[in-house]
Amino acid sequence: MRIIKQVMLATLMLLSTHSMADSLKVMAYNIMQLSVQDWDQANRAQRLPAALMSLSDSPDVILVSEVFNSDGEQALAALSTLYPYQTPNVGQDCSGSGWDALTGNCSNSPFVIRGGVVVLSKYPIISQKAHVFNNSLSGSWDYMANKGFAYVEIEKNTQRYHLIGTHLQATHDGNTEQEHEVRMGQLSEIQSFIETENIPVNEPVIIGGDMNVEWSKQHEVADMLATAHAELNFKTPAVGSFSAKDNWFTKANAYYFEYSLDYNDTLDYVFWHRDHKQPINAPSMTVRYPKAQNNWYWSYLRGNWNLSDGRYYHDGYYNELSDHYPVQVNLEF
């Protein structure tokens, strides 16, 4: 009987510890709202708020990327009842308006578009700063965008959290080694920023976004985590965050840009900085699969598709919100 009581007491103490723990749920989501070409931007953007607001296990913070147009910004504004604290769009205004600080290589050229990163929070943002990357690959599409990162310090239940949302250099041709080097340079800029901020070591630092690092290339993942001074728990899912095999909108992207219609990998991450306060729950990153409640028509999808398992006729109706699925980590401290 004494042993049973001791076990029960230990269990109650463990449950009490978890109930008292500070927690933060963080999502990274590339919503693919481009400023050029017809990718059904308006229809997807209109349906995004309802899909995010209906999610179970709702994130406290969303690190959003590829908000390159007004449709995307209007969708985020429609989420203000759930996420009343929102940063400006990184690189949209090189004056630094709306930020506590803006650093880096922000271009005022009329040919350069906004960076597309926005942070949404349920909890007050105490400080918000933006940086436009100095590292960028000349000749790539990314070179014509003020891509960088948004830093926020938020407060939830008296605990301060520091978050960085970003979108690293995309792969635009076969020279992945060169693009990987640029991505690591961009992560080094993030690390330099963290060091300069002198963030207390007893406060968490969380980094997330579309890193454009393929989970299947574990040597590149190792480089990413080492450069970012980061920790990550993630098991390969059946459907990754960027899956042409599962997501018909991603399949359309694969067809247009001529890569495998069966492509299935993860490019998006949320990890925590190893030099700051560590989570106590060994959190795992998961891929989430939000979809619109109802299907709608997009003419690009309609027709016969030659798939690996045979010819398939698509009627043009779909309910995907982006070519990426979001990833989420629930952290306890």
Walk through the language-model features, giving the residues of each.
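His/acidic metal-ligating clusters that form di-metal
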Residues: 148-166, 179-220
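Short, Asp-centered acidic motifs that coordinate Mg2+ and/or phosphate
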Residues: 24, 59-61, 161, 204-206, ...
